[in-house]
């Protein structure tokens, strides 16, 4: 069974774990570690594929922001965020739909990661102030990123993971 997320986008795969990260092309090919252009990262140890943010304006632009919306709870109109590529419906549901339409890295059923899944790429021991391996995720912002997990006692809210100290 295949499942996808956002970077956070992420794609869940059934493969043998070999505890390595791989750069992945927009078409889904595994690239050399020294490749300078890639769109996703395969984490073999967790059998997950992650979306990589871009320095270029577009759907994957690292400075885009979104409200959380799962189709039922949250902000469907992006009231609190108008800072996305299309300038409307700046929410996680619209973002996921647009990534799926693009067939990013050869996949079309991306989803937001769970809280546990997103925490697997937080790097507290790296050399960057941004708590992630910037060799694989160079455009990740020192900010919080949404998960698919809503708060138990208030399903209109969702958990975020901070990619900075003090978050």
Question: Which positions does each model-derived feature cover?
Answer:
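Sec-dependent N-terminal signal peptides
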Residues: 4-13
